[in-house]
Amino acid sequence: GGSCGQCRVDVHSGGGEILPTELDHITKGEAREGCRLSCQVAIKQDMEIELEESVFGVKKWDCEVISNDNKATFIKELKLKIPNGESVPFRAGGYIQIEAPAHHVKYKEFDIPEEYRGDWERFGFFDIESKVDEETIRAYSMANYPEEEGIIMLNVRIATPPPNNLSLPAGKMSSYIWSLKEGDKATISGPFGEFFAKETENEMVFVGGGAGMAPMRSHIFDQLRRLKSKRKMSFWYGARSLREMFYTEDFDELAAENDNFEWHVALSDPQPEDNWEGYTGFIHQVLLENYLKDHPAPEDCEY
């Protein structure tokens, strides 16, 4: 707890002193006004708190797994069906929370296509088991955008222990999500979030890598497909190799349809079979050297 900084609440009385874990996300001025992270506040007395109005729009849904497919070696796309007649009124860039019950997951039972199994076998990941004796809740950004109705789509990277110490515990939630199969049930709540696009005409620069694809896809599709935005925008995405790329056809299609949008990929570890002639290195450095460094006004862009 205390790592994402999203669960802000104003505590007007009670709650005790603010904790060091909270000060990574809350300024001293905000703390003086009573701002806290709700996940870090122990309820030991009567309290007076103030919540954002949007919190009261949060609901819970029991969903059904439509699919749970590998999009990269360590990333799955979990697609959930919202109950008939229901909808999750989220904004692009928002997130939901998903619940995992107590579980015992064996990685050898994961459904992983042959093209991705090599690294799993080389690192010994199929020997991992996740044993969790309590309910776990984690937050994930939506990869779909609001007009893709009736579903919730997540990009989930498996949190394995390091290959040199497989005795360490695996990620509780990612292990559970990777074990889900078509027809299984999953409980989510939401929507939440503050990572929303500003309604301006400023240039937009999207930067992401790995499972950070999710909010990028949601934002970009929302801007171009729903809002029909004519703002200049570019997407800079980093992956290890071509095998780790996904949604390529989606973004190629968007670029072909919209003169105001372009996207770029940088590979940090291209493989010989990739025959890669594009950008190499880490995406933030590639973005700086190949675009922002010579941009006339990078400070006016929205990132």
From Swiss-Prot:
Catalysed reaction, written as an equation: a ubiquinone + n Na(+)(in) + NADH + H(+) = a ubiquinol + n Na(+)(out) + NAD(+)
Chain residues that bind [2Fe-2S] cluster: 4, 7, 39
Protein name: Na(+)-translocating NADH-quinone reductase subunit F
Protein's GO biological process: sodium ion transport
GO cellular component terms attached to this protein's record: plasma membrane
PANTHER family assigned to the protein according to its UniProt record, in alphabetical order: NA(+)-TRANSLOCATING NADH-QUINONE REDUCTASE SUBUNIT, NAD(P)H-FLAVIN REDUCTASE
Organism for this UniProt entry: Alteromonas macleodii (Pseudoalteromonas macleodii)
Domain 2Fe-2S ferredoxin-type, residue spans: 1-45
InterPro entries named in the record: 2Fe-2S_ferredoxin-like_sf (IPR036010), 2Fe-2S_ferredoxin-type (IPR001041), Beta-grasp_dom_sf (IPR012675), Cbr1-like_FAD-bd_dom (IPR008333), FAD-bd_FR_type (IPR017927), FNR_nucleotide-bd (IPR039261), NqrF (IPR010205), OxRdtase_FAD/NAD-bd (IPR001433)
GO MF terms held by the record: 2 iron, 2 sulfur cluster binding; metal ion binding; oxidoreductase activity, acting on NAD(P)H, quinone or similar compound as acceptor
Family, similarity comment: Belongs to the NqrF family.
Pfam families: FAD_binding_6, NAD_binding_1
Disulfide bridges in this chain: none
Subunit organization: Composed of six subunits; NqrA, NqrB, NqrC, NqrD, NqrE and NqrF.
Function as written in the Swiss-Prot or TrEMBL entry: NQR complex catalyzes the reduction of ubiquinone-1 to ubiquinol by two successive reactions, coupled with the transport of Na(+) ions from the cytoplasm to the periplasm. The first step is catalyzed by NqrF, which accepts electrons from NADH and reduces ubiquinone-1 to ubisemiquinone by a one-electron transfer pathway.
Region (Catalytic): 201-303
Name of the gene encoding the protein in the UniProt record: nqrF
Keyword NAD: yes
EC number(s) stated in the UniProt entry for this protein: 7.2.1.1
Subcellular location field: Cell inner membrane
